[in-house]
């Protein structure tokens, strides 16, 4: 099979976003804030001009091809995050025992889940992630897609019921809407 000479992925940069590349570290600044990430892969080169970020690899094998696409997606998510932000909405569902959810610093505390006496806790990942609770709605917002998604997963996993049929015992906090919205 013929080997490709190189693979190049080009990511456009919006006008109000600046991308700085220092070696393998990519810094993206925008209206929402700043995200830094290190992409330390030997064969892959990342460069930019005023309008585009270019991810390139010469004579790639299968893993290098996949890594170029992965890095392109990460940089695209960073650009979108500082420009627009990410919002995940969750719903508190209970049948008999009313659970209360509170945000205390970097911890989400879930009290009275299935009548349990000890509270369940979920960690908020990242400094830029904000969790708000209004009634039965939990909203998670931030500029880093990975931190927002992991915080959402931590909250959902904290209310996972073990040893019972989840079709019958549907109590928990579940993802309702994933949205990429404009920053306020």
From Swiss-Prot:
The keyword Phosphoprotein does not apply. One of its GO terms (biological process) is cytoplasmic translation. PROSITE patterns: RIBOSOMAL_L6_2. GO terms for cellular component: cytosolic large ribosomal subunit. Signal peptide: none annotated. Keywords: Ribonucleoprotein, Ribosomal protein, RNA-binding, rRNA-binding. Pfam families: Ribosomal_L6. The keyword Heme does not apply. Part of the 50S ribosomal subunit. This protein binds to the 23S rRNA, and is important in its secondary structure. It is located near the subunit interface in the base of the L7/L12 stalk, and near the tRNA binding site of the peptidyltransferase center. Belongs to the universal ribosomal protein uL6 family. PANTHER family: 60S RIBOSOMAL PROTEIN L9 (PTHR11655:SF16), 60S/50S RIBOSOMAL PROTEIN L6/L9 (PTHR11655). This is Large ribosomal subunit protein uL6. The gene is rpl6.
């Amino acid at each position: 099979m013929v080997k490709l000479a190189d693979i190049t992925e080009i990511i456009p940069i919006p006008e109000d976003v600046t991308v700085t590349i220092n070696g393998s570290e990519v810094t993206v600044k925008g209206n929402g804030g700043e995200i830094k990430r290190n992409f330390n892969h030997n064969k892959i080169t990342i460069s930019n001009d005023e309008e585009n970020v270019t991810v390139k690899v010469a004579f790639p094998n299968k893993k290098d091809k996949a890594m170029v696409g992965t890095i392109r997606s990460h940089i695209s998510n960073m650009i979108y995050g500082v420009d627009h932000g990410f919002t995940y909405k969750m719903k508190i569902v209970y049948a008999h025992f009313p659970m209360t959810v509170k945000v205390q610093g970097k911890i989400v505390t879930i009290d009275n889940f299935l009548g349990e006496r000890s509270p369940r806790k979920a960690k908020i990942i990242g400094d830029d992630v904000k969790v708000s609770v209004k009634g039965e709605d939990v909203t998670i917002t931030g500029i880093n897609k990975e931190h927002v998604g992991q915080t959402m997963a931590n909250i959902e996993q904290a209310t996972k019921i073990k040893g019972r049929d989840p079709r019958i015992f549907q109590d928990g906090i579940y993802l309702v809407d994933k949205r990429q919205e404009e920053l306020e």
